[in-house]
């Protein structure tokens, strides 16, 4: 969720502030992953992150690592995080963009005219108004991520499994249904707690998803 926020906030800001010609092109790039299935995108990450994949080839080419000491980026939690961040990133960008688009640019100009530096105007005037989008995007990404199954199962291997994969294992393999039910309860409790925290901090009535 934090990685999606760190990558999605600048992307949404560019979408909201760039000229229409460039923002439309960037929006197409954001929506492009939705034109392919989740399974295809996950399988593509397997090819990209494997030891003989594109990422390791580039790292060897620029001299960060040697050919004999390639990074292990797949079948572990690293691969799961990278693939899930890519898949979930649009769900963070779109709520943020919908909020940022409604913020008048005159607010920043007024802050600058009153003596605020660009950084201070952004932190004190612009960023607080984007909190509903941050909360909505974070809640959406968290709910989607906590129940993800396909991506960790294919990319994560044994060391990159999430709670949904553990529930499936105990339901289908070990037949420890009581543990699976307990894990499901933890899953539900986590979602409800985040929903409660969002309602207390921001207010569910202020949620803006689009």
Predicted regions and their residues:
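Transmembrane alpha-helix signature in integral membrane proteins
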Residues: 1-17
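Short loop segments and helix-boundary regions at transmembrane helix junctions
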Residues: 12-41, 46-51, 201-202
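Transmembrane alpha-helices
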Residues: 32, 86, 91-105, 116-147
